[in-house]
Amino acid sequence: MIFPVAEKFISINGESIRAGEPAVFIRFRGCNLRCGYCDTKWANSPDCPAEMLSTEELSSYVIGTGITNVTLTGGEPLLQEGIYELIEKLMKNGCNVEIETNGSISAAELDAMPFRPAFTFDYKLPSSGMESAMLTENYKYLRECDAVKFVSGTEADLEKAAEIISRFALTEKCKVYISPVFGGIEPKRIVEFMLERKLNGVRLQLQLHKYIWDPEKRGV
């Protein structure tokens, strides 16, 4: 299988379940959503330049780095035909695979895999313009190794995040994060909201890579 890879690089995980740890990133081209605040819009376009790499080439690259944490992102990785084969190959070779998905595509097949990766579902809040695409039935597949994150840009976003966390009892199933749209709502306000609402088990998360490097820099 051949994959359109917008970029591949080694860095630290800037967010989610392995934040701060070294990781290999594979960013695939193409996404089925168009979020208003998306910080990787360039990778969503079918015109985005991409390396066309086979399963074998990608797995050889990842394994050759010597880094065991692997983040498959995009774009939307679950749009990629052959993604299950790639995940299985990586995990059979000792990699810890995390799938960053926008939450609009069923995770049933991934959940049933003998070599199951960790999921990070990105619930799209009202300011994204894409909330109607969210497939909340995916939450029945959540395990302790998984995460749901809420990227918030407004007070309405925070209110909706609290509602979804409560409705689906997410903190009882997996890690839960609220993070600010970079340059938008202040992290301090998110902390205040979490304390006001007694959001036990919910974590504030900042995109570490945007504080270490230029927020617009790619490949980090």
Identify the residue ranges that each predicted region occupies.
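Amphipathic, alpha-helical segments enriched in basic
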Residues: M1-A6, I10-N13, L33, Y37, ...
